[in-house]
């Protein structure tokens, strides 16, 4: 009996609609499609006889979770995680699909929500700092051996915008776009000179980019 009463109380709480700003926490689950690219490098003669000068990531399905807390009616802070189920390609004198790669992103973020908290539609944007992990890839070498590449984690930022939609309850929907550039390396970019600091070598940074179009469900507490 006590268990049933507890469940009933939870359901009543979730179905209730307190004042908009009283619902400060949001949890979202999202799915989408991510457009990805890799980076270029110096030509490398591989054991298969081909020359490769770029690694690329395939566009693919992605999903994620995020949790935010509204510190004011417009400002939100939180953490987000995302995963893209991609494949790693080598490009050069031929295109070679190396294997499956999982790309995981981890970012703390600050967001801004437009309009009042009880509005049906609330446009938003956010900016985050964190890291992107490129998972290991299992592949077969030209000699028929099973090999595995190492995983790599690099600093990344993330930027996003979209709209949240609520129908008056605790459950809503969201749709938006998110761009995540991940720093990979810097190539020599030449020399820069000025009359005060002298001359120094500058780099040309390369980023692996992910552009996600997605949507999902929001639970507001």
Each language-model region and where it sits:
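Gram-negative (and chloroplast) outer-membrane scaffold detector with strong preference
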Residues: 23-26, 33-35, 66-144, 150-157, ...
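Predominantly the C-terminal beta-signal and adjacent terminal strand-loop region
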Residues: 40, 51, 86, 168-221
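Bacterial N-terminal signal peptides
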Residues: 7-16
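Outer-membrane beta-barrel translocator domains and adjoining extracellular loop/strand segments
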Residues: 39-48, 89-95, 135-145, 185-193
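Bacterial N-terminal signal peptides that target proteins for export
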Residues: 1-7
């Amino acid at each position: 009996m006590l268990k049933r009463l507890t469940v009933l109380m939870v359901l009543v709480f979730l179905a209730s609609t307190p004042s908009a700003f009283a619902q400060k926490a949001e949890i979202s689950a999202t799915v989408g499609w991510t457009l990805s690219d890799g980076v270029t490098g110096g030509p490398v003669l591989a054991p298969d006889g081909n020359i490769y000068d770029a690694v690329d990531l395939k566009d693919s399905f992605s999903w994620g979770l995020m949790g935010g807390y509204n510190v004011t009616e417009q400002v939100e802070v939180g953490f987000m995680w995302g995963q893209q189920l991609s494949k790693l390609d080598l490009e050069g004198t031929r295109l070679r699909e190396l294997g499956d790669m999982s790309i995981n992103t981890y970012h703390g973020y600050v967001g801004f929500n437009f309009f009042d908290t009880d509005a049906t539609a609330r446009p938003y944007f956010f900016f985050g700092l964190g890291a992107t992990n490129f998972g290991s890839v299992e592949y077969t070498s030209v000699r028929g051996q099973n090999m595995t590449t190492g995983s790599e984690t690099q600093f990344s930022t993330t930027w996003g915008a979209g709209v949240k939609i609520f129908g008056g309850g605790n459950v809503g929907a969201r749709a938006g776009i998110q761009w995540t550039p991940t720093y990979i390396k810097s190539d020599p970019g030449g020399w820069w000179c000025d009359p005060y600091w002298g001359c120094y070598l500058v780099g040309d940074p390369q980023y692996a980019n992910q552009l996600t179009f997605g949507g999902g469900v929001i639970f507001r507490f």
